[in-house]
């Protein structure tokens, strides 16, 4: 039997459902999700393998107009995938009109010389007439290889999109073992799960100012639990107070919710300790960005 493989980038503005789509395809959480824009900060591979194919999806940070060094990192990280992949999924939301952000991405896609599939997500939120109007608008902007409407949240048409990708794969190598689902180490996934809970539970001023560093992660032979120590980094003392909460209640809630997800991922009992530290203006300091896992070497 001929084996086929290829790399597929998922690009789009923030909050269009890229990570939700990847997690649905993979059947488990690879990329964290929230309703906050710019939740994804790093490129994350989701490695989808069957007996006849391997599709390596690359989930990317939402492309936006950056205001910090962290924002620059995120946007360059996303665009760098255009040099690495065989196909691009350009994802747009069905319930929002085409905007300047979409046009900016389209101009880069036109210059990239790689096949682009337009994925219109969130079709569960609109009337079919609105969907058709949205598709026509984007079709007039560039020549897409395919246009596929989906609902990543409900799973509508997702398998059809995977089939289309599979049909267009070239014969190739199996780049990763069949049981490997991502390129990131467990420590990275743990830090992202803690950050996800911070995004879910705290107010608007917190999300973009938070980074999570896993200081240690090892199994305790006596308790047969994985002991994890993680530090939540913020930029201001006021943010530290919000995350800790009254009597430590918020930090305890963050830790409890994160621990459940981490246990599901690892298949082990977990003892999670979390601290909060202030690192002023870390989003504009390249050394701090590198220390917290946002390294220019990624692109």
UniProtKB/Swiss-Prot annotation:
NCBIfam families: era (TIGR00436), PRK00089.1 (NF000908), small_GTP (TIGR00231)
Species annotation: Streptococcus pneumoniae (strain Hungary19A-6)
Binding site for GTP: 12-19, 59-63, 121-124
Protein name per UniProt: GTPase Era
Keyword Metal-binding in record: no
InterPro entries registered for this protein in UniProt: G_ERA_dom, GTP-bd, GTPase_Era-like, KH_dom-like_a/b, KH_dom_type_2, KH_sf_prok-type, P-loop_NTPase, Small_GTP-bd
Subcellular location per the Swiss-Prot or TrEMBL entry: Cytoplasm; Cell membrane
HAMAP family: GTPase_Era
Record-linked Gene3D superfamilies: 3.30.300.20, P-loop containing nucleotide triphosphate hydrolases
Role summary: An essential GTPase that binds both GDP and GTP, with rapid nucleotide exchange. Plays a role in 16S rRNA processing and 30S ribosomal subunit biogenesis and possibly also in cell cycle regulation and energy metabolism.
Domain of life: Bacteria
G2: annotated segments: 38-42
